[in-house]
């Protein structure tokens, strides 16, 4: 092929390469890219420009810095209350799956008793979600202080550190646990083609009423396929509104 293209180039003839024989989805966007030493045709459901990605990262850094300041203040206030009710570490860390399947540690202010992970297996029969997520309205593992910091999303504040580190973005999809990810089908894994977010479409779309995992996946895929910086800004404003006015779905 290279020799043929060069011969046509020498004669001043434009060359077109037919890729329809590969039967690739016509809805995918196509672009020419250089990957290492190779020229390639790239296919993607939604191509995002480098400038837009840099704008998103800049927004993450700015938001992460402000968020860490808020986190420090929150820790000073609620930290002693968490420790008084349930002795143990103030912060909770857990392995989650991020962009392209990369494992990272997510951080939260501890809202459960220390044996929460062990007790989860006992409570799986009471899972209110249909699919690969776990959720209980009256989870007995949550402390009294934990209920408050979950309702106000204070427990999520340490994740601003994950945003600054680059593990997460301010807006994105929910990062699954390792055991959830191991049960994913190929379609579910599309949720991980972007960085997971501190907030996202599901969180601002009545998460207390959405119990079907497949519906959540559809919402996430739609977000990825139609992503824009302006959509992120809209989700951030809606998130702030829900935090200030209260979100009954925060469990």
Where are these regions (language model features)?
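Short, glycine-rich, amphipathic interfacial segments at transmembrane boundaries or analogous
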Residues: 29-32, 92-140, 199-220
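An acidic site on a long C-lobe helix of protein kinase domains
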Residues: 54-57, 105, 141, 153-156, ...
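Short, well-ordered beta-strand elements within core beta-sheets of diverse protein domains
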Residues: 67, 144-152, 221-225
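N-terminal hydrophobic signal-anchor/signal peptide
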Residues: 1-72, 250-251
């Amino acid at each position: 092929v290279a020799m043929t293209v060069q011969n046509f180039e020498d004669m001043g003839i434009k060359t077109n390469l037919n890729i329809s024989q590969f039967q690739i989805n016509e809805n995918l966007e196509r672009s020419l890219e250089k990957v290492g030493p190779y020229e390639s045709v790239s296919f993607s459901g939604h191509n995002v420009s480098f400038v837009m990605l840099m704008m998103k990262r800049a927004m993450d850094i700015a938001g992460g810095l402000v968020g860490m300041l808020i986190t420090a203040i929150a820790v000073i206030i609620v930290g002693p209350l968490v420790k008084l009710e349930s002795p143990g570490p103030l912060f909770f860390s857990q392995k989650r799956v991020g962009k392209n399947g990369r494992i990272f540690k997510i951080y939260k202010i501890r809202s459960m008793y220390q044996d929460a992970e062990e007790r989860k297996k006992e409570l799986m029969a009471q899972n209110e979600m249909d699919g690969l997520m776990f959720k209980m309205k009256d989870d007995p593992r949550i402390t009294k202080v934990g209920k408050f910091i979950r309702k106000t999303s204070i427990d999520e504040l340490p994740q601003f550190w994950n945003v600054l580190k680059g593990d997460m973005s301010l807006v994105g999809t929910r990062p699954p646990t390792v055991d959830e990810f191991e049960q994913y089908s190929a379609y579910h894994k599309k949720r991980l083609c972007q960085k997971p977010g501190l907030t996202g479409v599901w969180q601002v779309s009545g998460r207390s009423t959405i119990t079907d995992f497949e519906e959540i996946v559809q919402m996430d895929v739609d977000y990825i396929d139609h992503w824009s910086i302006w959509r992120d800004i809209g989700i951030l404003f809606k998130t702030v509104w829900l935090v200030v006015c209260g979100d009954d779905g925060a469990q």
